[in-house]
Amino acid sequence: MVERGPTVYLSGLREKHFGELFLNAYNVSESSSATQASSSQAASSELGLSEEGLKHIARYIEYFESRYNDIWLVFHHEGVSLSKLMYTVEEAEISSEKAEEASHGQILRPSKWWTWLKTTESGKEEMRRIIWQLLLGLKACHDRNITHRDIKPENMVICLEDIKSGRCLKGVPNGDQNFKTNMRIIDFGSALDEYTIKHLYGSTGPSRAEQTHDYAPPEAILNSSWHHGPTSLTLKYDMWSVGVVMLEMILGSPNVFEISSVTRALLDQHIRGWSENFKELAYKLRSLMEMCILIPGSSLKHGGASSKQGGISLASWKCSEEFFAEQIKSRDPLKIGFPNVWALRLVRGLLQWYPEDRVTVDEALQHPYFQPPPSS
C-alpha cells in the first residue's frame, strides 16, 4: 500500500506505470517467443537473449485505489532481498555519558551465506550469477530507455527456488538441497523515462530525494539537473550502482566508500566550519580519490598526477590495478578481495567518474568476467 501525500502518491503512480509497462512487455515477449519457436530457431534464440531480462524484473499484478485515495500495488512474492541474505543483524548497546540514556542499536555483520559466497567455488559462481541476472534486468530497462535510479541490495530480491517444489526456500539452503537462483529488481518508484519525467514527477521534476546517496554516481550527487543530458548518459547512473553493489558483495559491508578515522581526522582540520552535508561530500570525494576514481590535480581523461594541499598528500599513491586490488583485499574481513582480475576490471569499468567512460549494460554482459556465461 502507498499512503497518501503528493510525493509518495506520485512514487506509487510511477510504480504502476513501470509495472504495467513491463507486464505488457513480458506478455508480448512470451507471445513472440511462441511464434518464433515455430518458424525460426535462430530468431527465437535472438529474441530470447534480448528479452531474458524481463524475467529479472518484479512481476506486477494489479493496481487499485481505495475510497480514501490510498494506492494499492500488488506484486508477486519474489523471495528475500540480497541485503537480508548478505547480513545478519546483531543487537548492540550504545553507551552514553548518562547510564539512563543508554540505548540499543543494531549492527550488520556478514552472514554465513556471504562467507560461502566468498570462500567456495560454488559461491563465487553464485556471485557471478547474481550480477549477471542484475545486468540482464537492467538491459530490459535500458533497452526501453528506463533508468532505475535505485539499484542496491535492498532492491534485489532473490528466490532460491527449490527444484522439486518450485517454491522459494526459507532461509539459507543446506548442502543437501537442490535449488536454482533467480534475482528480480524491485522498486521502480525512483525510475526515469521520458513519460515519468514529464508527467509523474510534479512541477519540480526528479530530485536527490528519490536517490540513495551511497549508490548514486558523482554526477547525480554534484549536479541536480544531471538527468537533462542524453538518455545514453542518464542510463549510466545504474551502471555506477552495479559497481557499488559488486564492491559491497566483495567487502561484505554497505560502507563501500568509507575513509579511515585517521584520514577523517586529518581532513577535518581543513573543513572546520563546513555544514554537515558538505563534510559528508568531502569524505565521499576523499574515498573516491583513494579508490582512484577521482584523481585530483588533473583531468581523468589525461592521466593522473598527485597533488598536495596544506602539507597533506591528497593522492600520493599509484592508481594501478595492483594498488586497487590490495586496497580492497585489506578491507575485506576475510582478506580475500576480488575473486579474480576480471571482477576487478569490471568494477573499475563500472566505477568511472565520467558517465561516458562507464561501460554500458551490453558491454558489461560481454565482459570476460562472464565468460562463459553463468548457468541458470
UniProtKB/Swiss-Prot annotation:
InterPro entries: Kinase-like_dom_sf (IPR011009), Prot_kinase_dom (IPR000719), Ser/Thr_kinase_AS (IPR008271). Residues 1-370 form the Protein kinase domain. GO terms for molecular function: ATP binding; protein serine/threonine kinase activity. It comes from the Eukaryota. GO terms for cellular component: nucleus. Pfam families: Pkinase. Gene3D superfamilies: Transferase(Phosphotransferase) domain 1. GO terms for biological process: mitotic DNA damage checkpoint signaling. The protein kinase domain is predicted to be catalytically inactive. PANTHER family: OVARIAN-SPECIFIC SERINE/THREONINE-PROTEIN KINASE LOK-RELATED, PHOSPHORYLASE KINASE. Belongs to the protein kinase superfamily. Ser/Thr protein kinase family. This is Probable inactive protein kinase At3g63330.
